[in-house]
Swiss-Prot record:
One Pfam family in the UniProt entry: Phage_holin_4_1
GO cellular component, one term: plasma membrane
Subcellular location: Cell membrane
UniProt similarity note: Belongs to the bacteriophage holin family. Cp-1 holin subfamily.
Domain of life of the organism encoding this protein: Bacteria
Name of the protein in question: Uncharacterized protein Lin0175
Membrane topology term: Multi-pass membrane protein
Upper lineage: Bacteria, Bacillati, Bacillota, Bacilli, Bacillales
Organism (species): Listeria innocua serovar 6a (strain ATCC BAA-680 / CLIP 11262)
Length: 140
């Protein structure tokens, strides 16, 4: 049984690596943001008495869609030979998007949000554009 588990984990890692490329800091942070957004959404919905399995399923579907788009972006980078430029731009876009959602969830619970976190949204958003501009230059 232990061998089957190890083979399964190894297989998952291989597929994950193929789909998303190098599991670098950006990928790890995106996964953390995705999990944090889902949990903060559950907390806010529970806090407000709005928790439902339908909303939970929609949340999971959106998170899977984000990962699919990151995987597609990585595959595009492989085709174009742009070394994760497209993937990183997509990741920065979704980092900003997930951070906005996380902060909104805490505001829904009546919490104040530190300005430094609000400012990070602008930084991630700018990085998303920077990566796209870098990609455009690579194509010239």
């Amino acid at each position: 049984m232990e061998i089957i588990l190890k083979i399964g984990i190894l297989g998952f890692g291989a597929v994950f690596g193929y789909l998303f490329g190098e599991v670098d800091l950006l990928v790890k942070v995106l996964v953390c943001f995705i999990v944090a957004d889902y949990i903060s959404g559950l907390l806010a919905s529970g806090y407000l008495g709005e928790l439902s399995s339908k909303m939970g399923f929609k949340g999971i579907a959106k998170k899977i869609a984000i990962l699919i788009l990151v995987a597609i972006a990585h595959q595009i980078d492989l085709i174009l030979g742009t070394h994760n430029t497209t993937r990183d731009a997509v990741i920065f876009f979704y980092l900003a998007n997930e951070l906005i959602s996380i902060l909104e969830n805490f505001v829904r619970m009546g919490m104040k949000v530190p300005e430094v976190l609000k400012n990070l949204i602008l930084i991630f958003d700018a990085k998303s554009g920077d990566e796209e501009e870098k990609h455009d230059k690579d194509m010239d």
